[in-house]
Regions:
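Short, surface-exposed "cap/lid" segments of acyl-processing enzymes
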Residues: 1-48
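Structural motif
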Residues: 9-17, 42-45, 80-85, 108-112, ...
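The feature captures the conserved acid-bearing segment of alpha/beta-hydrolase catalytic domains
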Residues: 110-163
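Alpha/beta-hydrolase active-site loop
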Residues: 42, 48-77
Length: 172
């Protein structure tokens, strides 16, 4: 399934970022292989101070799903998630399925992989790729390998380096 849109997801509120979404989008737009593909990142508002972590995660997924619906994104989409937001890839994928928007793949950058308990029989519904810089938790990268996902080791977390891998995956 070919990709029409690359969606660079912001970090979960309150968690460290694996990449700067704006810089990564810029790097992807500069790569000639992404010509003809729409590339974007959406903003997620800060949570209320009294929101518990479960509510923060639910609002993050909901805001992204609404943002994708209202921005006129064409599927199939390649979802890029980093850090703690990687654990939310199942929920974000299901939100796209509910919107009847196909997902061409998931790219987890130095990310937390979804727990085995959160995986349902119909997820992943598209190929999952793990991009591991030296900053990646080796246990998370190993979990990706054990699940049969492709792991792409990169020498650094520079947006151009990560963007090069993502651009190649978007055109595969």
């Amino acid at each position: 399934m070919s990709t029409a849109t690359i969606v660079v997801c912001p970090p979960l509120p309150g968690s460290p970022a694996s990449y700067d979404p704006t810089d990564l989008v810029d790097a992807l737009l500069d790569d000639p292989r992404t010509g003809g593909l729409r590339t974007l990142s959406l903003d997620v508002p800060d949570p209320d101070a009294d929101d518990d972590p479960r509510t923060v995660r639910a609002h993050w997924v909901a805001h992204l799903a609404i943002g994708l619906a209202t921005s006129g994104v064409k599927g199939p989409v390649l979802l890029v998630l980093g850090g703690a937001s990687g654990a939310m890839s199942t929920a974000l994928g299901f939100s796209q399925k509910a919107a009847r928007r196909a997902v061409s793949g998931y790219v987890l950058v130095d990310a937390v992989v979804p727990s085995a308990d959160s995986r349902i029989d119909d997820w992943p519904d598209a190929p999952v790729h793990y991009v591991a810089s030296p900053a990646a938790d080796p246990l998370e990268a190993n979990q990706a390998r054990l699940r049969g996902w492709s792991v792409h080791e990169v020498p650094d977390a520079d947006p151009t380096t990560i963007g090069t891998v993502i651009a190649g995956l978007a055109r595969d």
